[in-house]
């Protein structure tokens, strides 16, 4: 059956290692790599699963990343808890496109307050758990404000 010992595949064993408070991870099947929200280092990194990689490639810097998702076209969606927004990135793009929030911290339909978990469907509709507003928001592709779907 299963192995009783885990294996470190990214970062190290404790505080001060290469990753500092990773908050989310997904697998990019096309590149066979892990994409990680490295929260306390304020970045998103990619680690190959194919080799004994000793450090990750920085995809996006200067972001207080909480969670991430990837759609069918391999766009990366990242919730930024400091800017209270969600952006969509093409791999290699450093700036991204605003897709939810982005109007400062608040409770209006065009604002978020500590966006955490995100889900993107096949129509690129984004669902955001808007933690400190105690709601889940739906943002249709191209929308300037969201719709409360729960809370």
Segments the model singles out, each with a brief description of its role:
Residues 22, 65-67, 73, 83, ...:
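Conserved positions at the start
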Residues 1, 39, 81, 91, ...:
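Short loop/turn segments immediately following the C-termini of beta-strands
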Residues 33-35, 75-78, 125-127:
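Conserved beta-propeller blade signature
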Residues 2-23, 50-64, 92-116, 142-151:
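Gly/Pro-rich loop segments of beta-rich domains
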Residues 1-2, 27, 44-48, 89, ...:
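Hydrophobic/aromatic beta-strand positions that recur at structurally equivalent sites within the blades
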Residues 27-31, 70-73, 120-123:
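Residue-level detector of Asp-centered blade-edge/turn motifs that repeat once per structural unit
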